[in-house]
Amino acid sequence: MDSEEPPNVRVACSGDIDEVVRLMHDAAAWMSAKGTPAWDVARIDRTFAETFVLRSELLVASCSDGIVGCCTLSAEDPEFWPDALKGEAAYLHKLAVRRTHAGRGVSSALIEACRHAARTQGCAKLRLDCHPNLRGLYERLGFTHVDTFNGSVAKIGGSQR
């Protein structure tokens, strides 16, 4: 991906699964090495990705180099947002960017696609949870810290623009 080529964001298909699983594992290893433990990689496998593909909840960012980023977008998140009203928000999870493409707008493109999808679904908000070390990234992308869950997970919310 040259610096001028914006990533193309689309709903993932079954042919993307292996590449997405590798990308998520690589991202989790990188975050863990930086002191920002991510999701449980043992749970990130083909079955995990297939579930999101079947529900059209897995987005990928791609360019001439292949898949360079991904995330999930769901209609609910009972673990971190149990009291949320159904339909008031969409929930972004598992945002991962190939390290060779960090700083090139991949996260921004994925988040903008999630915002658009949330609006299309009639949701007023896009929410996520993240490690506190990642709050700055999301705040720079327009999100606001809402709460801290269990002392270790920042709950981040964003109103639709």
Whereabouts are the PLM-identified features?
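A short beta-loop-alpha structural element at the N-terminal edge
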Residues: 8-22
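Conserved acetyl-CoA binding element of GNAT-fold acetyltransferases
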Residues: 83-99
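Conserved GNAT-fold acetyl-CoA-binding loop/helix
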Residues: 21, 25-48
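Conserved beta-strand in the GNAT
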Residues: 60, 66-75, 91-96
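Conserved acetyl-CoA-binding loop-helix of GNAT-fold acetyltransferases
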Residues: 97, 103-116, 140
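Conserved GNAT acetyl-CoA-binding A-motif
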Residues: 111, 118-130
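C-terminal "cap" of GNAT-fold acetyltransferases
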Residues: 84, 124, 130-134, 141, ...
